[in-house]
Amino acid sequence: MDELLSIVQKAVDEKKGERPLLYDFRELNPFIDHVVICSAPRVRQTHAIADNIKDRVRENGYEIRAMEGNSESRWVLVDLNSIVVHVFMNEERDHFQLEKLYADLPHEDFSL
């Protein structure tokens, strides 16, 4: 696993992200290598996870391309160029079902 993925994995784990999954997009998309999906039971925790990813990534010298979502968003997207992280509230994750959309892609549990 590359360094940036390890940083993201640890950042999600530190804030108790639930059901983390890692999808391999390298065969499908020339712009991103991986997509990470995780969730949390509350909006506050959702944002804590996203903020921790942002902080840990920057601490290690990597750039954040973009973060989408405001303080009340139930879905926050963190774009790290080669990795895109979706942090959902549990209900939003169940509603949008990205796992079904990505079902044919190689994926694995991203828990520590």
PLM feature spans:
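Short, aliphatic-rich beta-strand segments
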Residues: 33-35
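Polybasic/polar functional segments that serve as interface/processing modules
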Residues: 1-31, 41-76, 90-94, 98-112
